[in-house]
Amino acid sequence: MQEQRAERLRIALIAGGTSGEREVSLTGADGVERILDKEKYLVSRYDSATDLPRLAADAASIDFAFILLHGLHGEDGTIQGFLDLLGIPYQGSGVLGSALAMDKDLAKEFYYNAELPVADWHTIAAGDFFYSEELIEDLGLPLVVKPACAGSSIGISLAHTEEELLAGINHARDCSAGAIMVEQFIKGRELTCAVLGNDDLQALPVLEIVPGDKYAFFDYEAKYQPGASEEICPALIADALREQVQDHAIRAHQALRLRGYSRTDFIYGEDGKLYLLETNTIPGMTETSILPQEAAATGMDFPSLLDTLIELGLEKSKGKKG
């Protein structure tokens, strides 16, 4: 029995943190810790808000880190760089890809350069003045307002009037000290598609998110309030649209130099055009989260998905890419 335990991969499960998505992170980590195969893995928990010195001290005895941090210092390359310094491999993208995807403004520039369709937008740098009349003149109404570097729809709002635009910008600034994005609101169907792999990429089945009647879009409450939205996987869409979404998800993954896995969100507009919204490098990881649902639609259960992410992370560390 002792020999069997010695062969188990020693996993540092990193969660918590200090961002506004702390509780989401901890909930996901509870599920992952429960689901990880105890015959394969020996799991230790670390909260990045308090346990980084302990993680550094334990580095020599850790085989792999599973990151379940969201938002600031989790998805932006910070923890990835720390683990690189410690020589601990981890799942998902490295410093560069994580930082690019976390900065929604910069990511949209990369999408645009890769000829991927995006809604028009303006970015207001932290502390900069802006003219609401010019934003409305250039982009029209309604407008989506959100922090450029936050996740889980934190700080996001929909503005139908100039007054709502000003309130939305102030709200976003309350939620983030960084830049604010103002972009055209595209009314349509919300679709999302995950990608698995390092070099050989696989797009998973497309999932459609149908927010409840009280939600104009998939905001924080619609994401995490039970019953607030319906998720349909595989999405009931035409084959041509499904192929386009999967193609664009892979191209977004490549454009941002991502590794291991990602999930890209889209809107299929009422104008019949597909628009890319953003890419998430550490998607939610509860059993009912989108990525596990998409994996399940291919026949991959949650434990197998976790195994795959760990295997891809170990493969990435050997190749020293991303």
Swiss-Prot record:
Cellular component annotations (GO), alphabetically ordered: cytoplasm
GO molecular function, one term: metal ion binding
Family listed: Belongs to the D-alanine--D-alanine ligase family.
Bilayer-spanning residue ranges: none
Record-listed ATP binding positions: 136-192
Alphabetical keyword list: ATP-binding, Cell shape, Cell wall biogenesis/degradation, Cytoplasm, Ligase, Magnesium, Manganese, Metal-binding, Nucleotide-binding, Peptidoglycan synthesis
E.C. number(s) listed in UniProt: 6.3.2.4
Cofactor, free-text remark: Binds 2 magnesium or manganese ions per subunit.
PROSITE patterns: ATP_GRASP, DALA_DALA_LIGASE_1, DALA_DALA_LIGASE_2
Location within or outside the cell: Cytoplasm
Name the record gives this protein: D-alanine--D-alanine ligase
Function comment: Cell wall formation.
Residues reported to bind Mg(2+) 1: D265, E278
Catalytic activity: 2 D-alanine + ATP = D-alanyl-D-alanine + ADP + phosphate + H(+)
Pathway info: Cell wall biogenesis; peptidoglycan biosynthesis
Pfam family, one: Dala_Dala_lig_C
Residues engaged in binding Mg(2+) 2: E278, N280
ATP-grasp domain span: 108-311
Reported cofactor(s): Mg(2+); Mn(2+)
InterPro entries the UniProt entry points to: ATP-grasp, ATP_grasp_subdomain_1, D-Ala_lig_Van_CS, D_ala_D_ala, Dala_Dala_lig_C, Dala_Dala_lig_N, PreATP-grasp_dom_sf
GO biological process: cell wall organization; peptidoglycan biosynthetic process; regulation of cell shape
